[in-house]
């Protein structure tokens, strides 16, 4: 499916089109060949090139960053200088390609221009890129970074409720690979947090919303990582709970759940986005969020919690009845 479904809310509070960023992780292609694939797809100018990373500046699109997803290797390459000039770093880079995924970080694009990325995934596939299902030890995936329509508490709370009501269903909708489920990288929110989130029908103050999240989720390893967005609002609170310099403040959600199926000819980034689209739409339905939250709490059983399979089946039927799935 190559059509990106458009959400009901396309613009932010300033009237600007919302932006979406994608990060794609894969193996099977060297860093050098990945860069070449991008250059063969768009008119690109290389910048900041090392043996572990390269930025490609593309007119009318922005900067696509290509890098080996290994913090140590990237640091060593930066210290060595320009692209492939240090033999030791270059050798290490080549060895890393066997086990370390290449990551392509796309620039944030206006929500109506996401189809500009379709040629990229096709070119990477032709170059030999392999996605989630090709590794038993690595949890390759696609990350989606949609800008939040507004940074007020009510808006963020509704997105959190929408995702939380759907998180089990989303795992099934994406057919998340067992290897990825077994890691901590895409852990779901704990049920204790969901019960707290659903226990009121009025949005908490922003400081309380952030504090509640950090209390239950003091980690980057969540399927919907809110730390970048909350850091944009209150960086000190986030760093106090999760002192990690990899957290970059930005007014976006960081959705990490989808597989990367780049080696499949019938897959594109639209497949991943169109599942997230369901979260977008549910987040705009205040009354439905209230009703579904109450229903979830009614289903809670002492010690056992909510029965997952039953809830997934209920949500799947509800979404179909409301033309959201």
What are the roles of these predicted feature ranges?
Residues 1-102, 108-122, 126, 151, ...:
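C-terminal accessory/tail domains of diverse enzymes
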Residues 136-143:
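Short, conserved phosphate-binding/catalytic loop or strand-edge motifs used
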Residues 147-149:
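Catalytic palm subdomain of template-directed nucleic-acid polymerases
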